[in-house]
From Swiss-Prot:
Entry protein name: Probable transposase-like protein At4g04430
Organism per entry: Arabidopsis thaliana (Mouse-ear cress)
Span list, region Disordered: 1-57, 307-328
InterPro entries named in the record: Probable_transposase_24 (IPR004252)
Superkingdom classification of source: Eukaryota
Stated family: Belongs to the transposase 24 family.
Biased composition (Low complexity): 30-43
């Protein structure tokens, strides 16, 4: 009759089947058989020992298979298709978390570029039907309220005018910052260099200068020259040991440089705003003159088209001598235009 040790051994084998063919189990069996022979009892022969098969780690095979898939293949795999796709929730093995994040961020950057602008355009055409399915209704409601706000619409129009209009003849104002705001770029620069305050002039150089060293627009080039000239002027009149604004190397501190940059930038923005206001005043005056004197408005309009037509400076102006009455009207129009723009009257009649 089997002893209690045999029962314990069988239970242990059921719990841990990997140790069936272990040397310890074999020793126990032989020990039991030996004791049965000595006691005179007959012990049934043990079943043939199965051949030990090499263990296969299916976990590693699964990980290798997933690592060889692209993001699209991973999301379209049969394992993922079994989940509820309407919930937009995906699962993957923890061992590929880093790769999934890299793939996700790359896809996000390509898909989300100008995405909000496209949403707004679709909303203007289709209304709330343009809402993407995955956007929270409260978030979409907030976007619609922002798009309908007159202040945000005015800000959008001003930004569009600033991008596509050349008010001072120095080319359209551009930048190379992309979708990254200047504030975020300044924060990243501080994290990279360890500075507490970023150098605004270096940020301007980073976001407005091409790889060949040239600026992308004339306005940025002018501001950069004015700021650097002012900094050199201040540094040439200071002593590094006596002036607290200087650094140990004899130059201005970052705070002082940023102060100069802010002053020059504020002056440039004020100049642009003043030009915009003058242009607006001229438009109002022109509308008033067009209503009161259509003939004078036609003369002004003809003069503007003539100036635009003479785009080539090498071509001599071809115009007939104006009659005295027409000349007087043109002189009056020029005086009114100078009054609106705040400039001095020209010496010759246009």
């Amino acid at each position: 009759m089997p002893s209690d040790n045999t029962f314990v051994r069988v239970r242990q084998q059921q719990r841990d089947p990997l140790h069936v063919n272990s040397p310890v189990s074999g020793g126990n069996i032989s020990g039991v058989q030996g004791s049965g022979s000595r006691s005179g009892s007959t012990v049934p022969p043990s079943p043939p020992t199965p051949t030990t098969q090499p263990s296969v780690n299916h976990y590693d095979v699964q990980v290798d298979r997933l690592n060889n898939l692209t993001l699209e293949e991973l999301l379209d795999s049969p394992d993922i298709k079994g989940y509820n796709r309407s919930m937009q929730v995906y699962n993957w093995d923890r061992s590929i978390n880093k790769r999934v994040r890299v793939e996700f961020e790359a896809k996000l950057k390509s898909r989300m570029s100008n995405q909000v602008s496209r949403w707004k355009g679709n909303w203007k055409e289709k209304g709330d039907e343009a809402k993407p399915k995955w956007i929270d209704p409260d978030v979409w409601k907030g976007l619609v309220q922002f798009w309908q706000d007159p202040k945000s619409e005015k800000k959008s129009n001003n930004s569009r005018n600033a991008r596509y209009h050349d008010l001072d003849g120095k080319d359209i104002y551009k930048h190379r910052s992309g979708q990254t705001s200047y504030k975020a770029r300044a924060r990243k620069r501080c994290e990279k260099t360890g500075e507490t305050t970023p150098d605004f002039l270096e940020l301007l150089d980073e976001t407005h200068r091409k790889a060949d060293g040239t600026f992308i627009d004339g306005k940025s080039k002018e501001i950069y020259k004015q700021v650097t000239s002012r900094i050199e002027e201040e540094e040439s009149h200071m002593c590094s040991m006596d002036n607290p604004e200087s650094t140990g190397s004899g130059g201005l501190s970052v705070h002082s440089k940023n102060k100069i940059f802010t002053e020059k930038l504020a002056a440039a923005e004020a100049c642009i705003q003043s030009q915009a206001e003058r242009i607006n005043s001229f438009d109002i005056l022109f509308d008033y003159l067009a209503e009161k004197d259509p003939a004078l408005a036609a003369i002004l309009r003809h003069g503007s088209s003539t100036q635009i037509g003479q785009a080539n400076p090498n071509e001599p102006p071809v115009s007939a001598a104006p009659e005295p009455q027409v000349a007087n009207e043109e002189t009056a129009a020029a005086a009114l235009a100078n009054l609106a723009t705040g400039s001095s009257p020209p010496s010759t009649v246009f």
